[in-house]
Design a protein with these regions (language model features):
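Amphipathic alpha-helical regulatory regions
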Residues: 1-16, 29-33, 47-70, 89-95, ...
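Amphipathic repeat-derived elements
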Residues: 5-7, 12-34, 72, 127-137, ...
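Residue-level recognition of alpha-helical structural elements
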Residues: 20-23, 49, 84, 235
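Short secondary-structure subsegments characteristic of cysteine-rich extracellular domains
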Residues: 21-37, 237-249
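Structured all-alpha helical bundle cores of eukaryotic regulatory proteins
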Residues: 24-39, 62-107
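Flexible helix-coil transition and linker loops at the boundaries of alpha-helical arrays
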Residues: 40-47
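C-terminal effector modules of eukaryotic transcription factors
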Residues: 84-103, 107-264
């Protein structure tokens, strides 16, 4: 309940900017109570609380994205570090990590549909011709002789897989979409956040150019979700920050993400 109330307060803060400070405080109050309940529940997992714990993890992801994104006071923190995932990516992945004990139980319950990701495991971007995949593949030359090339290759492969996952819905009939279930095209960027390696995320926080470039392409996919209030501005902000940090040498590789957000 407190998780729902925290999101409701954040959404009101988004809708009524003049009252944002008060509403964000209310949201934080309820979120802290929800977190304490979550931590207590994780310590004694059972069939009776597994669905509630999983539901909170979903609510928490939306809360974190809204709090660090459209509702963040940019003057109060290092905006570049924030945009590059400091705080919000660990908050999303951290909750996911402690949920492993409840996952099997959730798959047998009423929230099973939330756990399904369709044909994700069968997708292979190397065996399919998909729009824009050439842009993703082109950036591999940036790190081809880098000691961390395997880490970058894996993260890029997963991002290309997300692109394939999203593109299949563009030609899917409404009937097929209805049968697919909950996790459709919009879920792909979040799949990547959970699937990409800690080693890659460490390199991103170190602001290594190849890691930044991959993150800009993640921003291009995230920009497709700009119509959701809690994702508003995320894709654009990521691409702009990466562009500023990389400088002119990488212009030809970051051109496509900038084209996506219509920035020259």
């Amino acid at each position: 309940m407190h998780g729902i109330l925290s999101l409701a307060a954040l959404h009101l803060a988004y809708r009524h900017p003049a009252d944002k400070p008060r509403l964000v405080c209310i949201a934080a109050y309820h979120h802290n109570i929800a977190l304490r309940g979550f931590q207590h529940g994780i310590s004694q997992v059972n069939d009776g609380n597994s669905d509630a714990l999983y539901a909170f993890s979903c609510l928490n992801m939306v809360y974190v994205l809204a709090f660090f994104g459209p509702l963040c006071d940019g003057a109060s923190v290092d905006s570049k570090s924030r945009i590059l995932g400091e705080g919000w990516i660990p908050a999303i992945r951290g909750v996911d990590a402690v949920l492993h004990p409840v996952y099997d139980r959730v798959c047998r319950g009423p929230l099973d549909d939330l756990t399904k990701i369709g044909n994700w495991d069968q997708l292979n971007p190397d065996q399919q011709v998909v729009t824009h995949d050439d842009h993703f593949r082109s950036i591999q030359q940036v790190w081809e002789s880098n000691n961390d090339a395997c880490i970058y290759d894996e993260s890029l492969y997963l991002l290309r897989k997300c692109n394939v996952y999203m593109k299949q819905f563009e030609t899917m009939s409404s009937e097929a979409r209805a049968e697919w279930g909950y996790n459709q095209d919009w879920s792909a960027p979040f799949i990547w956040l959970h699937a990409t390696s800690k080693e890659y995320l460490d390199l991103l926080q170190q602001r290594k150019p190849p890691a930044l470039l991959i993150f800009a392409y993640f921003g291009a996919l995230a920009h497709a979700l700009d119509g959701s209030w809690f994702m508003e501005g995320w894709g654009r902000s990521i691409i702009l920050v990466v562009d500023e940090l990389l400088g002119g040498y990488y212009d030809r590789w970051i051109k496509w993400p900038k084209d996506i957000i219509r920035i020259k």
